[in-house]
Amino acid sequence: LYQEFLKLKAMENRYNLIFNNGIKFGGLLGAIFIFLSLIYYIADFNMFNVMFGLVNFILVIAIYIVFFGWANTELRVKNLNGWLTYPEGLLHTFIIGMIAAIIQVAYNYLFYTLFDPEYLTKMGEKVMEMLENNPNLPAQALEEAERKIAEMTPAKSALQGLYYSMAMSFIFALIVSAFTKKKRDIFDETGLQTPEEQQ
C-alpha cells in the first residue's frame, strides 16, 4: 500500500513539473513570437507578399518544432529522470503553446489599441486593394470581404489569432511528442530524480 502511495505521489510530482515547465517555456515561446512580430513591424515587411508569406510560414513551423522538441527533451532529461510518455509530452507542449498563445493575444490587443490603433485599418485597406486588383473575384465575394474587414475589431483579431495559434500548437504538439517520448527505465521506481541526482 505504501508503495502505491509513493507511485501516486511521484505521478503527481511529475504532472506538477510538467505544468510548471510548460508555463516557463510557454512564456519564453510567447516572447519569441512577440519579438518576431516587432521585427516585422519595424522592418515594415509587406505581409501580403507571397514570398514573405511562405518564408514566415516555414519559419513559424520551424520555431514550433525546434522549440517543442527542445522543451520536451529538457523536461525529460533534467526533471523526469530520462523518460517521458507520449501523453505527458503532448500535455507539456500543448501547455507551452497555450501559454504562448495567450501572451500573444494580450500583446496583439495592446498593440492594436494602444501602440498603433490605425494598424488594423491599414491592413484592411491593403487587403481590399489586393482583392480589388483581382479580376477573377466575384463582386459578391468582394462585398463579403469588405463587410468582414469593416466588422474587424482589435478584440476579434486577437481572438482569431488565439484560435489559430492554439490549433497550430496542438498539431505540432501531436507530432513532436511522438519523437520526444522515451520509455521508462525498468529500474526506476519513482520516475523522478533523487535529490542526489539533481545536484
Language model features: what each stretch is:
Residues 1-16, 184-199:
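Low-complexity, intrinsically disordered extramembrane tails and loops of integral membrane proteins
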Residues 5-75:
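Transmembrane alpha-helical insertion/packing segments
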Residues 20-28, 88-100:
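Alpha-helical transmembrane segments of multi-pass membrane proteins
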Residues 32-40, 60-67, 100-104, 108, ...:
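Alpha-helical transmembrane segments of multipass membrane proteins
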Residues 70-88:
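Membrane-helix interface/capping segments
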Residues 106-135:
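Functional transmembrane-helix hotspots
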Residues 130-153:
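Short membrane-interface loop/juxtamembrane segments of multi-pass integral membrane proteins
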Residues 154-185:
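Transmembrane alpha-helical segments in integral membrane proteins
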